[in-house]
């Protein structure tokens, strides 16, 4: 339905490009076309198209947020809901890629597969704590990017080691930054320190 509404909203512009003697296609027509598409081929074409858009934009460091999502309304009585991972270039508001996972618990591999297909030079990739994995970091670096990976208690050993490392840093003379934000019914205070010592 959204595609049909978009076609009507942009009908004058579309008519400059293609003849639409019967008006824009209905949502049923869009549905039939999408059902006939090869998803893998569409993904390849979509990535090539977004890469061309990225090349046309002014060069700067790009923040790419990678996350998994559950598609609302995709569950039925038999099948689990569709799970996808996507890469979002936040400043340019551009989806760089979307990949369906093989179900719950397969997000890590899907994120790595998605990242392998992207050009990440001059990019900083951010992920949630689930994707704080050595293999994910290696894929990002191999593709020419940098990364910021969240670390939480879902990896208790790494979390404890890193906490001990940070306790030492915080007690040293290393300068830090503190921010406070109010939202979602709470006040969040964040403290930041940076160290180039990754040997811990």
Indicate where each model-derived feature is located.
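Conserved, well-structured functional cores that handle cations and Mg-NTP chemistry
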Residues: 1-127, 132-135
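Generic secondary-structure signature for well-ordered alpha-helical cores
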Residues: 39, 116, 145, 167-171
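A short alpha/beta connector and helix-capping loop motif
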Residues: 80-84, 134-153
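Aromatic side chains
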Residues: 42, 46-49, 147, 165, ...
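Alpha-helical structural signal in soluble globular domains
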Residues: 117, 135-143, 161, 165
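An anionic, glycine-rich sequence signature occurring as long contiguous blocks
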Residues: 152-200
